């Protein structure tokens, strides 16, 4: 009777997770029930935003080693497979921490155009300056970037699990 009913109620209980934001001294600021995450509901604008930010992170140089290191981590967290290799090869030839000692590179994305279900064409301009913002060069680039939605591995840098799988970028002459 009663024992069976208590067991049934206990076995039916569900824990509902909450996301809670706290101050540095532990005081709760906000809290909300965590919803299940369905990657098929990621809006196209969010994907475009991630690809836009990737170009800024991967190609820009702030001239501040802390910012540049954070941008390197952010760009790497958005890549996997061939794209990770392409990015690593690029950084071996164009290390933002070395470049940033004598130059800054500002990125201006000009457009993002979907080409296939998971590939975008992105064009941008790179303006290289001295640390005092004197122009050094201006170059235009274009890339085909392919992405996929996967499991979230890095909540800080890639909370949506949007991974760039292939990068083909070239300078426009």
Segment roles from a protein language model:
Residues 46-71:
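Short, aromatic-enriched amphipathic alpha-helices that serve as compact interaction elements
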Residues 1-45, 66-173:
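Structured, amphipathic secondary-structure segments that form assembly/contact surfaces
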